[in-house]
């Protein structure tokens, strides 16, 4: 269970903390998962810094599980770097800290990277005891220096190295396994040739294969959606005489048996809904899903249905959105507002900035009316 994320000096962020721990509200208990709230939403005007937070998560996913030859450090806040000057090392360092629990252990993981393409400091604490520390190329594991060997990239986290070498260390491997189950969907980049879904556990699964693998389950979920066509994805087995341009996957609608369309003709709305549900269903219970601008993929009514599936699946979800309709289903401790001011972004929890808010209050109406006085620059 992810408990807290703290990000410092990454992209537009000065410092930002997202706390998943529930407050003492006595309503909407369906949004409570153990001692945390789920999902958690981030709102804010364009340019408020919401995307910076998700790009930090993306950077973590890449560092922990992707091709070592393509790793890059967290991009630091350019305003801070320019103000401090290139000689100030701290201004060139970005970091992320995570508190989480898994398999009965409480962890604190800290990872920083620098513009010099190295890791100034990384550490993993388990149950208040230091398991390892990686600082300026020197790795201390269980209190002893750990040999890294030659030709090890300075940007490969120590956690990644140790989890692959010390496979019998269940405490360490459990921490790495938990963080490796993070998945990020960068919806503003959904038309990018480089892809927009990031998850080391899903590997190189193609869009078609992902849709096909969860087609039956998605179809049953869609039965609960209002006015949504029911369909399934079928995989076409190629024959020796098949044309090279024959579609590999087909779209089949319920009630129109015997007829199908190439998957390429599937509408963007249908594809986005199916992809989000297929990805969610592919994640293990207890995994974490991060989605930037969820409303780019889902209709307002579909977002609420999607959040219902998130609750039932028991996957933690952190998302940003401009669709305020979802606010009607969230508690004050589930909502954060991003704010950009003088070059720095931060996030503010509604239950902190407006502690007297109650169930009777209309959060959506208050937000649209600028009652909270929180938001970024347009």
Go through each PLM region and give its residues.
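Electropositive, glycine-dotted interaction segments
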Residues: 108-233
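Conserved P-loop NTP-binding catalytic core
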Residues: 35, 39-41, 54-108, 114-116
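Conserved ABC ATPase signature
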Residues: 38-47, 236-281, 288, 294-301
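C-terminal lobe/lid and adjacent interdomain/linker elements of RecA-like ASCE P-loop ATPase modules
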Residues: 1-4, 304-378
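Pre-Walker A-like glycine/lysine-rich segment at the N-terminus of P-loop NTPase domains
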Residues: 1-62
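Catalytic P-loop NTPase motifs of RecA-like helicase/translocase cores
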Residues: 13, 297-298, 326-327
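Conserved catalytic network of the ASCE P-loop NTPase/AAA+ motor domain
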Residues: 34-35, 102, 281-283, 309-313, ...
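Short polybasic amphipathic segments
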Residues: 3-5, 94-98, 118-125, 129, ...
